[in-house]
Amino acid sequence: MKNTTAMADYELRHIEALRKNLAGCTVLLKKDGNFPLEKPCALAAYGSGVRRTIRGGTGSGEVNSRYSVTIEEGLQQAGFTLTGMEWHTGYEQARKKAHKAFLKQLKKDAKAVNQNFILYGMGKAMPEPEYNLPLNAEGDAAIYVVSRISGEGNDRTPLKGDIRLTDSEVRDILALDKKFTRFMLVLNVGGVVDLTPVMGVRNILLLSQLGVETGGALADILLGKANPSGKLTTTWAAFEEYPEMPDFEDMNETRYREGIYVGYRYFDTFRKQALFPFGYGLSYTEFRLGAVAVEANGAQITVRTSVENIGALAGRQVVQVYLSKPAGKLDAPWQELCAFAKTRELAPGETESVTCSFTLPEMAAYDTETASYILEAGNYIVRVGVSSVETAPAAVLHLDKTVTTLQANNVLGSTDFTDLTAPAATMERPAGVPVIEIDPAAIACETVAYDRIEEVLPEVDALTKEDAALLLIGDFDPNAKGFASMIGTAGRHVCGAAGESCDKISGFPFLIMADGPAGLRLAKEYYEDDKGKHAVGSTAMPASLQEMLSGPMKLVMSLMGGSGKPKPGCEIKTQYCTAIPIGTALAQSFDLAFVEQCGDIVGEEMERFGVHLWLAPALNIHRSIRCGRNFEYYSEDPLVSGKMAAAMTRGVQAHKGCGTTIKHYAANNKEYNRTRNNSIVSERAMREIYLKGFGICVREAQPKAVMTSYNLLNGTHTAESRGLIMDILRAEFGYEGIVMTDWVSPITGDARSAHRDSQAQYVAAAGGDLFMPGNKGDYDNLLQGIDSGAVTLEQVKINASRVVRMARALTQE
């Protein structure tokens, strides 16, 4: 609950900036004209999300903010009289019983596979329970709020209570829609839920998970103070309609057999039926697109149109431009998003001119046979509209011969299968649209210098082998074991931080890192004594972890994390951070300016609390709706993902001494056994889908750091892949920052795995700069690698020089 009298000025400013933009992150999926409401009224409020509102997912995505407004609180603050509150008393009883059984089974399952209960249960969400409670409340309108949560460490399931609705939910939603003239189904979810059984409901709002003001945002929308203007960045469909992924649950190998046909690329090309397609979203008002003009200036394509608000309420619209490419040597999806733009808020009757642009080389396909990006000869159809299924052809770009846009190298290994390919089809040239000839000579072929030489700083060159190696390992306590080894020396200088680089060498600055991606996660309260900084109680511990622990275990974990009870008279200091919307919700806004503003909020709080690197944003692709961390990620589309990550990075890095860490590079699209699972992906799919967003972010915003993923790629750990790090990231994308690992620890892997964890010596040899969080074993491994020749001392010092340069740049030393 909000208590503004206790809040600092920065908190109030940040919350105000967020609140007025949150409706832009929500997606109105269905409407019948009965919303918005004219004024606050008696509202029958049902569903777990009314009182147990989810503001974001679990794991690294959790944020320790001062408060969070539930939907119940937000509606009451807005003046609604809520009815049906006795339903929630009954629901809590059913949930408590189910949760007790859930934890009991979780402990049993962990024991059966000889795993630590806490690590085994990380990210596992209890399915919604079944219940049988009366719906006897009256009111002028009604809502039912479906909530789902997921998180780091585990994936979702296609079961009732998770991806599917429970029988209880379906029964009550349909009953309420029948009983009330004004009924809204509200989805307080971070990922796709199969809505097949309730598609007859007249009003559906994807509220998503919007951070601290989630409840207030819904009140604004119901009352028409704010108008939903988001668009889906992931295709919503019945679970059976998505591509089959038979080895998604395989412990060791995950084969990306669908190739480039991910999300709408699959649905459009293979004529699959979506419930709600990519790019889709309604508004309380109506819009009309004007005439479309397409121009070509060499390889630069510019699309101009206008948007008119022809409805009765103010609102915003998103113009989307898609490109259908010719299928020749390479097959091609039916269409791919190539540009988008969002209008300002338009009053009824108001019109705005909109311009979108892209370059043809940005849309090139990767030919593995020639190791090059190519644009094949033929017709390129430009489609313009307001969703992936609501477009019209606007122009045909004709290229009379195939051109190469970039000559690369195949560096990612091979697969043991052939990618899914599109059925042979001839795309007819649409009638009545202009044909624009593209001069092949105007499309330059980019060359890449893969053998660039990097200098070693003289002061680093003068270091001993032992000291140079220290700079590549996250700061560690040589005596730490178990959980303590997993978190390194996190929080020594900033309480609740996720990790630090080495501070053991005089004259060399160090970096402080904090988790995200929905804001900074730091200890809310801490105190200092002669032994350092300590979190008060469990204020540094994620709420999802606290829920799983008994009282004694909470105490043990708090003490291990440096938490404790301050002595009388000790000053208690605070680090309240703002929880911004989850990544998927931000992307649904299609509002780059707002995403950059969110980055500005995070950057200001980083400056305030002394954090150099934010371990975010995360821009992995929504390959499967089962991925437990999809809420952190932006989209199934790499253009959206890259643009959003770049906007967030610009906002953060506008602040002195602050940088982002884009992650997880790459092909980290499931959580089960993530540290030792091998993603088997074709070079083409990697480059066109899973790496493309990273390239966009690097070229547009140059994040200070990149975090590799836990998984292997075609048999090699991503953190140990020189092709990924040096050839593609640095040489092709032009990356200038540092590369770190994800938080590797031997206690997080499943002992039954066929693959090992990544190792510091091989990470360094691949050009990785920081092995995180760091422990004595990692340091010894690196020294052994130097002695054995697995990594040269010169490479270690090159990597160390990059770390030192970045630390100096961010600490201003």
For the regions a language model picked out, list residue spans one by one:
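Short beta-strand elements
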Residues: 390-407
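Extracellular/periplasmic metallocenter environments
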Residues: 371
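Glycoside hydrolase catalytic-domain context in secreted enzymes
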Residues: 1-365, 374-390, 407-813
